[in-house]
Structures are given as C-alpha cells and as structure tokens.
C-alpha cells in the first residue's frame, strides 16, 4: 500500500495525551505502523554519560501510532484525509481530500 504519511509531512495528533498538537514527521517505521513526530509524545529518558554527552534526564520523542495521526491540510492546517491522483504529466501525487490541494509535488 502507498504511504499516506511520509517523512517531512506536517501532521496533527487526533487522539491521546497530545491531541490537537502538530509537528513534522521525523521518521516513519512502516513495519510497526508508527512514526516519530517533532515535539509530540515526549518521554523522559535517563541518559548515561558518554564522551560526547553528560549524564542526565533527556526529553525525546517516542513513536506514535500512524492511526492516531492525520496529515495537516496545506491550506488551513486542519486534519485531512489523503488521496492519490495522477496528474496530466503522468506523476502520481498525494492530495488533501479536504481542500483538494496537492501535498507533494
């Protein structure tokens, strides 16, 4: 199946502790149906001291289920579903079903 959410997309969280927050997708993990989103689903990690870093408690993003995310509409930033269409020049692109705007390309 084609990827509806890709790295670099602006997404909105639909459910959970961070409902309504938005951010950029840093990484998609297709085998687990999860994604890392900047500034969303932050957890505290206890960091061991290394040569480059000192010890302490660090906040970092944890993976979130793809079903809990929706792509933000390029026009108004609200959550939208994603569709696919083929342009006249033969390229297959994703578009926002809410506004009809092309997401990539």
Swiss-Prot record:
Pfam families: KOW, ribosomal_L24. The keyword Acyltransferase does not apply. The keyword Ribonucleoprotein applies. It comes from the Bacteria. GO terms for molecular function: rRNA binding; structural constituent of ribosome. Belongs to the universal ribosomal protein uL24 family. One of two assembly initiator proteins, it binds directly to the 5'-end of the 23S rRNA, where it nucleates assembly of the 50S subunit. One of the proteins that surrounds the polypeptide exit tunnel on the outside of the subunit. PANTHER family: MITOCHONDRIAL RIBOSOMAL PROTEIN L24. Part of the 50S ribosomal subunit. This is Large ribosomal subunit protein uL24. It comes from Methylocella silvestris (strain DSM 15510 / CIP 108128 / LMG 27833 / NCIMB 13906 / BL2). The gene is rplX.
């Amino acid at each position: 199946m084609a990827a509806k959410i890709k790295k670099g997309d602006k997404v909105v969280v639909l459910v959970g502790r961070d409902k309504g927050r938005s951010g950029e997708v840093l990484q998609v993990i297709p085998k687990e149906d999860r994604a890392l989103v900047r500034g969303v689903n932050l957890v505290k990690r206890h960091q061991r001291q290394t040569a480059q870093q000192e010890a302490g408690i660090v906040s970092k993003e944890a993976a979130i289920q793809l079903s809990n995310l929706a792509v933000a509409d390029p026009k108004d930033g609200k959550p939208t579903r994603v569709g696919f269409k083929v342009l006249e020049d033969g390229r297959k692109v994703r578009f926002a079903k809410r506004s009809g705007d092309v997401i990539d390309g």
